[in-house]
Amino acid sequence: MGVKKKKEMQVTALTICHQDLETLRFLADVEGKNLASLLLYCVQLTDGVSQIHYVKQIVPLLEKADKNGACDPIIRSCLDILAGIYLSLSVKNPLKKVLASSLNGLPEFFLTEAIQSFTSRLQEELNTTDLYSYRKVIDNISSCMENFDLGRAGVNNLLKNVLHFLQKSLIEISEENRKFAGNRIVQTQLMNDLLVGTRVSVMLVQKIQDIQRIHLKTSSSPTWQSMCGLLSIFTKFLSDDDLLQTIQSTSGLAVILFIKAMFHPPEKIPDLISSLLLRSVDCTSIPDWFLNCCRSLCCTDVSQSTLLFLCQGTLTMLDWQNGSMDLSGEALLLNIVHILFTLSSQIKESTLELFLSRILASWTNSAIHVLKSSSPSLKNSLNGKSSVVGRLLEYVYTHWEHPLDALRHQTKIIFRNILQMHQLTKEKSNSEVSGLAADHFICDLTEGLLRLEWHVKGKYTCLGCLVDYIGIGHILALAKTIPSQILEVMGDQSLVPYASDLLETMFRSHKNHLKSQALDSTWIDEWHETWVSPLLFILCEGNLDQKSYVIDYYLPKLLNCSPESLSYMVKILQTSADAKTGSYNSRGALGALMACLRTARAHGHLQSATDTWRNLVSSARIKQGLIHQHCQVRIDTLGLLCESNRSTEIVSTEEMQWIQFFITYNLNSQSPGVRQQICSLLKKLFCRIQESSQVLYKQEQSRSKHEPENELTKQHPSVSLQQYKNFMSSICSHLFEALFPGSSYPTRFSALTILGSIAEVFPVTEGQVQAVYQLSHDIDVGRFQTLMECFTSTFEEVKILAFDLLMKLPKTVVQFQDSEKLQGLFQAALELSSSTKPYDCVTASYLLNFLIWQDVLPSSLFDSLKTQQTACEDGDKSAIVVERNTLMVIKCLLENLEEEVSQAENSLLQAAASFPLYGRVHCVTGALQRLSLNNLQLVSEWRPVIEKLLLMSYRLSAVVSPVIQSSSPEGLIPMDTDSESASRLQTILNEIQPRDTNDYFTQAKILKEHDSFDLEDLNVSVQNIGASAEVKGKERKTCDVTAQMVLVCCWRSMKEVALLLGTLCQLLPMQSVPESSNGLLTEEQVKEIGDYFKQHLLQSRHRGAFELAYTGFVKLTEILNRCPNVSLQKLPEQWLWNVLEEIKCSDPSSKLCATRRSAGIPFYIQALLASEPKKGKMDLLKITMKELISLAGPTDDSQSTVPQVHALNILRALFRDTRLGENIIPYVADGAKAAILGFTSPVWAVRNSSTLLFSTLITRIFGVKRGKDELSKKNRMTGSEFFSRFPELYPFLLQQLEAVANTVDSDTGELNRHPSMFLLLLVLGRLYPSPMDGTYSALSMAPFIPFIMRCGRSPDYRSREMAARALVPFVMVDEIPTTIRTLLAKLPNCTDQRFRQNHIHGTLLQVFHLLQAFTDSKYRLNTYFQQELADVAVCTRAKLWLAERQNPCLVTRAVYIDILFLLTRCLDKPTKGNQPAVECLGFWEDVRRIISGSELITGFTYTFTVPGLPQYLQSLTKLAITTAAVAAQAGEQAGNIPISFSQLLESSFPEVRLLTLEALLERFSTAALGLGEKGLPPLQRNMGETFLMLAVKENHPECFCKILKILHCMDPSEWLSHMQRCIHLTPKEFLIWTMDIASNERSEVQSVALRLASRVIAHHLQMCEETRDSVAPTLKQWVQLVVSSCGEHLPTESRLAAAEALTSTTPFLLTSPHPVLGLQDTLALWRCVLTLLQSEEQAVRDAATGTVVTAMSQENTCRSTEFAFCQVDASIALTLALAVLCDLLQQWDQLALGLPVLLGWLLGEDDDFVVHLENTHQVEDYLFEKAEINFWAETLIFVKYLHEHLLRLLSTSSRRPLSPESLRHLRRTASEQGHLLSQLFRELPPAAEFLKTVEFTRLRIQEERTLACLQLLAFLEGKEREDTPVLRASDSPAEANQFTLAKTETAH
């Protein structure tokens, strides 16, 4: 919300040559009043901004001189100097424009002299011969022509010279560009010069052609010759593909412009250009000069780009307006568009595609201009039904989903222009309405667009254009629910911007329409109903994403359009806020209300905060919103408080109180998005405070004039300022308290981020600036130590935030007086940098950086460097201090590393166990990354350090490479479970030297051939390892080393070396020449680094190794491409050619690593190509792709297998690389061909690589999968769009598919000949026809359909299924019924003798998938839909034998039954005035006959070995369930039903029972939630007895689980009464049986049984006393069961069941005024609630929060808190639960018995502290065991809340609740624990918080618990805190004490 600071203007001061300076000195008068004096003073200034002031005084001074009527020599000389000054200024210098503007006002008297001066000076400029000065001259010519009269006059005077100069300069620059081919940096500058020169030539001719046409009349004139020369140059540029396309494009403009200027007569120009474009130039009829200049355009074939840019030039440079075009011009217009259509189908390059789209849009603009005064024939050619418009629309439909945003934008322009063109071709109509109704083009267009699916982005833009064109009325008449439809899709982020823009267009149009027709204000009701009501529905009921996007995109636009609608929305939401309170997954009306108010306030639709709180929303609602269970409600409420459209709006007292309340409970958010929003909103609030405080300070300063008042609080500014200070100080205190020991990662992240924002918003001020708050004032030693302690976090984000915050504090805050402490910190950092724990070195890096930047390194480090220190005292003190410190630390680390590498060279095992090497390297990299290495002052000292660093990196890499580059480092090193592993490691490390060769493919598996696997080689190698295991290592001491340690040491060392080398390349300046003094890296060192990366990328076999090298290599290549050193700049190109040659030659001796994915080779080439500048021609990419695609193609040469696999793998990597963007798209078609053909290879490696490449291409073409459905509409493309983007694939795919289809139906079904069918169907299945496809495309999808149908006859089951899925998108929705009938007709009759089940199955699958697509379409329920389905049903009945026993194949029977099932579902809908179509057709009789005759009734003779039996059972059961359900709903008698639910449940097949139970469970669940329309039918309602009997005898686990779930859903009163009669169990016995199941079964059944038992208990407890007493004895077992289900180690489902059990029994067991259970059991249940509230699982916490909400909403507890009946978050639910519990203890009068238990919770008696301490020592043995990582639960927060509530409880208690004996026991326990803690603190080493973080944190937490307990005990004894013998500071070591003292109050 802060106001952006205005960017300061940078103006370079003007200067003049020495001679001119002397002239001015000579001419200046003594008084300093003449022009020379003014100019002299001006040029002597060094500030350009000040000079502007004096430049503006020139003309006023000359105006005075003009009155004297003489132009004296002084002024003449000054004008000459001014001309020189103007031409010397750079084109971007603001002084140049200021000077031109001033001289434009020159008095007429001086114009002649001034023009002469400018002409003279410009002539001097034109005479220059220095090629690298040409650009400056060209810029000057350009400047003279732009709004500068003197300059334009000078150019006119020198036109001949100027043209000659431009011709000469362009020729010479072009030649220079050719010489520097390959030097990108120089070429970029030269091409830019060419571009500017071309543009200036165009501008020159445009601006002076009318004045200078006389020069062009004679062909011998120099001007004419120069023009011809320039035209020749531009023609050459136009055809030169080595130039930038912008140069070619501008040359196209220049060619047409020059032709227009030079060709006579002008009326023949359109014909001439037409003949040029159509390649039909008659060379005999054109002038010789034209033929000489444009011969390449007239007589040879031109490239696509040349033709394209000529079209662009024609449309831009010819005058299409004002009716200036005759019939030849109209013909040219039509010729251009047909050429563009042709080019559209040929161009593949993305940049040219973009050019074409812009040119096509430009063509539509020109067409509109011409149509305004065109001939009737042109209007006929361009009306809505014309072929041109049809093809334009096809272009729009094809490209409106294009990946390039700019191209999609052009389609919108084209579509909008098409509507305008159509409007201009229409005949005028008397009535707008009749005109619209009669306009078939617009009507068809509108209906076609509305028929499209909403996932099509182009639909939105085109509908928006239509609304602008015809208004909203017609569209609302066709689709009244369109607002709801659009809002429905706003859950998809990719569609949201399009949808919101369309909605805005629509509701604004609708509002204007209604207002224009209305007589009063009632129109707003209709507008609200149409646009606001759907919005409110989404806000209350929509899904999370949908609501968020609607609020962010739609709501602001709606309020901006109609601010008065806010009160309407608030009124509706206020009334429903109590009913719709929301939950953890629903915002409810309260959330919607907060979102609306937040948006309104942020956009300035609320007058002030005070009005908002008073009139629109209550304080209680605000607080509810701030702790609501739904995170977005909390965020929106916070946003309402923080955001304002006025950055200086004063923050009210209420707002500050609410913010404090919010921060208390919302720092610990697990969602990164929520944390980011909280921090962002609070930063906005702080900016408001900062900016409004400045306003208050100003008011305070002016109070002497009048008494100012705060507009909100009506109080003095000083009071508000003091409130601000108190508020900020309070916030910071709370944030520092949140960094307590054991605080979670989210809490620390949030607190540190907010503190960082405070430090940023309230910076340290200097001078007179008044600051309302400064964070540094609130930082003491304790808080400083707290921030330091954050470095020990296992999350690097926390370390970064803490470090950044410390860096923002002034150095005076950070005071280190104790040199021992400094030495200890430095030693701790060094120790951590060599720790065996991988995360310790990160802590070390931050510690060292902190010591470096704060200049607090121990003095002992500098003892050997006194001379350097004295030499560094000059210059920038702070920068050089940091540089010196960094250098010293790196030297220290290097010395240690050198020693350790030497030891590692002798024994890698010892290094891995004692000093893994990577930590030191990590710290070096960390130190270098924070230092600005481009302007070092100690260069001479850095050079040997860098050299040593490089050598050390290579040595270290050599030590670990044997492990990294071995064939299998993980496999060859034995696992830690082997007791002899440590002794065998060294021997094995010697065994795993790399022995990889390039013979990977020599034994490639060929299809239909089998290779035997010989175990002897493996046995020999195992024996060798075993024999060597006795060899002892040479280390002096025994190392406790594991295989994991060795691997981590080696892999991380390699990673750190790669990152270090990459960092050095990226940050260190390179020496441009060997003797250069400014660079640190020499050319030779850079090449060495490149060779290092090359070796690891090309020869490492493991992904981890080459990925690490890739990271550094990318940094190196990026630097090399920008390097001015030409030899270094060309290195990537040389490396690329070398590796491509090595891949092509396939030499067996090659060192390239050949694996199934080519190891690091693709990464290597990827890095080389991705670093190529994207703005160039991308020549390396083009050549490489050409080579790779030729290698990837099929080959008969077995020697080519390795290159083919490499090529396929490299192509895959390149297509995956997003950095290549659209530049890779032209090669997609060839890549797809290679992948599909490669899949047919007999070599497995080729097939494997082809599959991977194909998968990548599918993602590249159709996008990353964005839906659950494999063929999601979001990942599909219309056939026309696909084939227009990749036209080469049309004939290829069709040909391949035809080849497959022609052989797949043979008698033998030779599938193996065409394994590519799978890939073909996969591609085709992602295409679909669009209703907008026109008839103009030659790329029709129809030819594919018969071949896909034939593929359905494949003998392979998966292929038949894929063919069926692939067919669906090829058939238009309204053609599906016809296609289904055709397919059904092909099925055999029961009388046919010969038929193949594969054919039947394939056809039936196609019918099924087509029918499924049709029934899912939007045609549901209309008459057309029902009629078409009825016709399909008739055809289906004709082949009914396929579903009966006459068909022996169960697979085809199953599919046919699935078809019947679909039909019964869709036909069972009554049409208007008729009974359901199913009944009319007699369909149910057929279905019942099939079921009656099926094996479900007669029994099965099959076993599970019969193919298709499970599938058949499932299909038949689904149909039977539908039949039974329909009959039950209709109330039919049991005798009329072929099979009942009870019979299905008695089936011997579990599949049948499971499906039936699932169907019944769905119905019972719906009925239990009250979502059913009429409840359960009678036949289903009375099944309780059936389920009881099933529950007892069911053995199948899943079925048993479903039965228990159904019983849980049913009302227990419906079945408990039948229990004794049905299963002979009493309620008590049934409860025990259920709990036994919950105790013994697996987790899912256990959870369901616990829920069921809890529901039964709740039912009994609310019944009569006798029933209650019967279950009372079993409650203790139930309590134990619940307690055992709450452990954090248990599955989530168990804990969710426990939470649900607690919620259902809360009113009876947890909060009952008369407890049923004993106090111990009741408190045990409450402890369960508190445990679940601290779970790491969000779902568990939410469920437990439901228990708390229930608990505090009972009659006897609703006054315990202020949030009764509110949906609250788990963070506040914890304290609310404790509040309710303490209140209940008083109600029950059980304080004396309950208090010891609660004090035990406080002390942590349930956590065995001693066991924890013993386990701590074992932690050291595990390499990656970081500590008890907590993402949410915080022990001390629980302690804090419990302490607060117990203190409040004891304060309000009227009598002492505990006896002296109880007090003594508790005190003794706490005191013993305190003394143990003291002893343990003393045993810790110095800097324990860093070196022993886990133990230190655990001790600190226990210390806080002990202190809290002792304080309460002291309070109980009536003593003051000071008299309590608690743990004292002196009991802790000094190192721990500094932290402990600062944190004593944290938990209180």
From Swiss-Prot:
InterPro entries attached here? ARM-type_fold (IPR016024), THADA-like_TPR (IPR056843), THADA-like_TPR_C (IPR056842), THADA/TRM732_DUF2428 (IPR019442), tRNA_methyltransferase_THADA (IPR051954)
Q: Which Pfam families match?
A: DUF2428, TPR_Trm732, TPR_Trm732_C
- Could you tell me the superkingdom of the organism this chain comes from? Eukaryota
Which ranges form a coiled coil? 883-915
Q: Which SUPFAM superfamilies match?
A: ARM repeat (SSF48371)
List every stretch annotated Disordered: 1924-1948
Q: Would the keyword Disulfide bond be found if you checked this record's keyword annotation? A: no
Keyword Transmembrane helix in the entry? The reply is no
Residues found modified as Phosphoserine: S1012, S1021, S1158
**Regions of compositional bias (Polar residues) in chain numbering:** 1935-1948
Output one GO BP term.
Answer: tRNA nucleoside ribose methylation
Q: Which cysteines are joined by disulfide bonds?
A: none
Which keywords annotate this record?
A: Coiled coil, Phosphoprotein, tRNA processing
Role played: Together with methyltransferase FTSJ1, methylates the 2'-O-ribose of nucleotides at position 32 of the anticodon loop of substrate tRNAs.
Q: What family, per the record?
A: Belongs to the THADA family.
Name recorded for this polypeptide: tRNA (32-2'-O)-methyltransferase regulator THADA
Q: What gene name is given for the protein in this entry? A: THADA
